[in-house]
Amino acid sequence: MAAASGVRRIKLGSQGLEVSAQGLGCMGLSIFDGTTKVETDLIALIHHAINSGITLLDTSDIYGPETNELLLGQALKDGMREKVELATKFGLLLKDQKLGYRGDPAYVRAACEASLRRLGVSCIDLYYQHRIDTTVPIEVTIGELKKLVEEGKIKYIGLSEACASTIRRAHAVHPLTAVQLEWSLWSRDVEEDIIPTCRELGIGIVAYSPLGLGFFAAGPKFIESMDNGDYRKGLPRFQQENLDHNKILYEKVNAMAEKKSCTPAQLALAWVHHQGNDVCPIPGTSKIKNLNQNIGALSVKLSIEEMAELDAMGHPDSVKGERSATYIVTYKNSETPPLSSWTS
C-alpha cells in the first residue's frame, strides 16, 4: 500500500477557490449504508482529515436528511471552520419517502439559510444545486444564487449532475466554480461532452464516487457483507447478473495494483488524480484507516503507458448496469425550460 504523504493544493475553477487536491465526501457519515455510527468517532475522522491536509469537505442538506450538516457544524467548532473549504448542496428533497427537486428562487434562499444555521457558519464556500429542477429555467436558479453571492452568504456556485448545455446557460448568468459529477474507472460517460465543456469554460471538476461506490476498495464480494439498509444493494451494477461481468474489471485493476505495490482503491483513485490539476475527487469513508489509504493515492505515480492501460481496462464494455437508480435525475435528463417560459 502506498503511504500517505502531504496533500497538495489546487485551484478549483477560475474564480479564485483553492482546495486540497482530494476532498472528503461526507455522505456516508450520516446515511445510506444502514449501519449505526458514533458521532464522536465521526468528528474525530473529520478532524483527522483536516489535520492531514484534506480541507474540502462535501455535504448536502439531503444527507440524513440534514443530520450530515449538523455533524459538520459540530466538527467545525473551536477554530476548525477557518481551516476548511466547506461545500454543501440544495435542491434534492425527500418527502413521504419520495425524492423531489426544487430550484425556484424562494426555495433556493430558504435552503441556503437553513444550511447556514445547521452548519453554524455565516458563509458557505461552495454551494451546489444537487440535482437540476427541470421545471425551472436554470437562469432563474442561478440568478438567485448570484444574489446570495452578492449578499455574502455563499462564495462560489456549483452544479451537480448537469449536462453541458445546462452548464453553459448557468455559467452565462454567473461564473460557475465547479461541476460535481460521477467519474471513475467504471463511470466515464462524462468524458464525452461535460468534461470538455467544463475545461473550455474554466470550471473545476469534482469527482464523486471515484472508487465506484466502494467497488474498487473492496471488490465485488463486498456486496455480500453489506447491511440490508445499504442503498447500494439495489443499484443495477451490484446485481448478480451484472456483478459477474463487472468483477473482471476489478480483477484487472487489482493485478496492476499488486505490480505497483498499492491497493486497487489507490490505483483507481490515482487514475482520477491523473486526469488533471482541475480535478478534485471526493472519496468518502467512515474509517481513518481507509482515509489514510485514500490520501496515499496521491503518491501513486502513473506513466502515460500505465494510464493508457487503465483507460483500456475501463472501456464502456467493461461495465454492465446503469450507475444509478432509474428514479434519480442525472445529467442525462437535466435540461430546463427556456428563460422566456418563466413566470414568477
Swiss-Prot record:
Keywords: NADP, Oxidoreductase. This is Probable aldo-keto reductase 1. The active site is at Y63. Signal peptide: none annotated. Substrate binds at H130. InterPro entries: Aldo-Keto_reductase, NADP_OxRdtase_dom, NADP_OxRdtase_dom_sf. Pfam families: Aldo_ket_red (PF00248).
